[in-house]
Amino acid sequence: VREIALDTQAATTVAVVDDGRVIARAHNDSGRHHAESITPLVREALEAAGLPAQLADAGIDRVLVGTGPAPFTGLRAGLVSARVLAAVAGVPAYGVSALDVIARQGLDLLAPDARVYAIADARRRELYWGSYLAAGPDDVTLEGRLEVGDVSTLLGAMRAAPGLVVAGAPIPAHSADALAHADIGPQVSLDPAVMSRIVATRLSRGEEDRLHTNPLYLRRPDIQGQPTARL
């Protein structure tokens, strides 16, 4: 199975995944200009993998995309691009929350019965976070729902149900002091191969409804007048 995986939660990352293994990757570290950078990054990743730069000729079987949570503009660009890429290649597009991927990566490094709190920077001195348990070796179960709020809300949840914080990047500076005495687990970089594992597992269970490409904004966009419920 050959996949294009892309994520625009913060920077823009495109990877080619072949049978669960990342064989090429391209990224733009800027948190801006997501829409403009995706197509060149796709071509760069395909060429680095030794594949035709034209997506329709590259033997892609599916397109994977991170569904957030993330700010409106970058997330929308990623999801729209994933749907367009899938249409061009004539293949399905599947979405996975970046926090699901971060949680699974953390659990890969911990005891199988661990609870983790996957976090990401939500800006405005806030965090996106969710509490997770393992669902077998390749998937996760979200306890409750994904949240957005200041670090005190996360710490309150951790007092009620202890677990380890797993960050998908360095812990945001605005929350680092408050989390200094919390139980900190691994810090990871989002791995497209883990996204692929989650997708494969959910498809094998007939759980396509958990692979939708709807955006997880969690709050209203900074740009007023834009829709939040759907693209």
Language-model segments: what does each one mean?
Residues 1-69:
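N-terminal beta-alpha supersecondary unit
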Residues 40, 44, 83, 87, ...:
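Short, well-ordered alpha-helices that flank and scaffold nucleotide-derived cofactor binding pockets
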Residues 47-57, 86-96, 111-114:
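Phosphate-handling active-site elements
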Residues 64-93, 98:
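DPxDG-like acidic metal-binding loop motif
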Residues 186-204:
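Short, flexible loop segments at boundaries between secondary-structure elements
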